[in-house]
């Protein structure tokens, strides 16, 4: 669906201001706009104050937010910051929602007015754009559940630089495509956060037009900052470990609805999630008890919503896709975490396993080549690559030494194409001399 040229004033969005400016630069902007008490504000509050001051200066108030919390009476609220409830939320009337057939998760842009004396929220005066498209055009979109899912058939090339060995190995062993539903199985301290950063940067290089989100559930605040600074092309949505489980659930559900609305208009959406385990733990605390309990204190009813989140990933026949790569935590010492992984095992069409033994020996990337694979990989890679890959898998021995030799050989090649040539050459020599390929 082509984007219409905007006719409203061009203000930088919250996401653009937050990503493109440091706190020092924002403070300078605040000084220029003659804001008061800006030194007491954190970065997010500072961005909102600057946006408000810029619009007030021009006599216009144009804001955007994600529709959430549609009430029984039909009205709703647009969330302006991090998909969470806040004081800068915007009220949208039931008539506007009905007229433009706006659904939960839609990004709505339009003219707003400041709250009056007895009001708490901004009020939306007119709807200009829905998901950055003409609001009238978006009314014609199909429903997500009516779209036909297919296996991924358009590859996401993760190999970008010679030194990025993690993504190079993924390209060889677990190729991914648009619409992939992948599980990254990770024990503690195996390098999952570094891997997610490398995957995110590789995706933004290969698929710059795709909408990339990173969802952090129950992670540390410093990891949020690290990812926001490391992956400029991604929108980082987070609910840190100090937030209540209800907040984890609300943020994850709203982001999923946002992704679905984009897929409905033909967009390619990618969500990197850390972690599905902590989301399942949050649901286990939030849902009413079913009276049944699995090992580790896990209520089986709590797994329905996390599985629905993960299961939403799909390649769409008519165009558009939703890719979800989620981490699952294992070997944490918690029986519940192991049970959650067991329930999710086999639900994806790609699994990448990280190995604690490799990480303890300081062998990085700590990828367990033998246990990692992609379903229907023949739709993503050429026949010659597939033949070489199967030849490699046949040689695999369940030992860290094999993986170490594999990584050493990979590091001696300029790129994966060169690596395949070296393998084929080694295979020919092996038939003559009997020496191992790796």
Model-assigned labels for residue ranges:
Residues 39, 45-138:
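N-terminal "pre-motor" subdomain/linker immediately upstream of P-loop NTPase catalytic cores
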Residues 175-196, 218:
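Glycine-rich phosphate-binding P-loop
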Residues 26, 46, 76, 93, ...:
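Residue-level signature of catalytic and energy-coupling elements of molecular machines
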């Amino acid at each position: 669906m082509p984007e219409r040229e905007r006719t409203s004033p061009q203000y930088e969005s919250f996401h653009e201001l937050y990503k493109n400016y440091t706190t020092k630069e924002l403070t300078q902007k605040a000084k220029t706009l003659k804001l008061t008490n800006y030194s007491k504000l954190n970065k997010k509050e500072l961005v909102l104050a600057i946006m408000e001051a810029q619009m007030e200066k021009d006599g216009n108030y144009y804001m955007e937010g994600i529709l959430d919390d549609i009430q029984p009476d039909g009205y709703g609220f647009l969330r302006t910051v991090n998909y969470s409830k806040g004081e800068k939320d915007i009220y949208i009337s039931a008539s506007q929602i009905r007229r433009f057939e706006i659904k939960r998760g839609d990004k709505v842009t339009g003219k707003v007015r400041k709250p009056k004396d007895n009001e708490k929220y901004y009020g939306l005066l007119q709807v200009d754009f829905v998901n950055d498209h003409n609001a009238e055009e978006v009314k014609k979109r199909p429903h997500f559940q009516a779209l036909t899912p297919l296996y991924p058939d358009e590859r996401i090339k993760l190999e970008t630089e010679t030194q990025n060995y993690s993504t190079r190995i993924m390209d060889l062993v677990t190729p991914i495509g648009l619409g992939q539903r992948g599980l990254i199985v990770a024990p503690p301290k195996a390098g999952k956060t570094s891997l997610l950063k490398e995957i995110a940067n590789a995706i933004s290089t290969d698929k710059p037009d795709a909408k990339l989100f990173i969802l952090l559930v129950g992670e540390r605040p410093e990891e949020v900052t690290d990812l926001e600074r490391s992956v400029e092309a991604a929108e980082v949505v987070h609910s840190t470990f100090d937030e209540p489980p209800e907040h984890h659930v609300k943020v994850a559900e709203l982001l999923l609805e946002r992704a679905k609305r984009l897929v409905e208009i033909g967009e390619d959406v990618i969500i990197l999630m850390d972690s599905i385990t902590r989301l399942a733990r949050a649901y286990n605390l939030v849902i009413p008890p079913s009276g049944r309990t699995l090992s580790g204190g896990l209520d089986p009813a709590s797994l329905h919503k996390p599985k629905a989140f993960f299961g939403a990933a799909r390649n769409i026949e008519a165009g558009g896709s939703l890719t979800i790569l989620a981490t699952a935590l294992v070997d944490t010492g918690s029986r519940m975490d192991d049970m959650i992984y067991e329930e999710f095992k086999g639900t994806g069409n790609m699994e990448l396993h990280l190995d604690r033994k490799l990480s303890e020996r300081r062998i990085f990337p700590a990828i367990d080549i033998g246990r990692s694979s992609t379903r229907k990989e023949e739709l993503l890679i050429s026949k010659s690559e597939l033949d070489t890959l199967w030849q490699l898998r046949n040689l695999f021995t369940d030992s860290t030494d094999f993986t170490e030799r594999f990584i050493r050989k990979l590091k001696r090649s300029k790129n994966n194409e060169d690596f395949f040539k070296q393998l084929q050459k080694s295979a020919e020599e092996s038939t003559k001399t009997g020496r191992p390929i790796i």
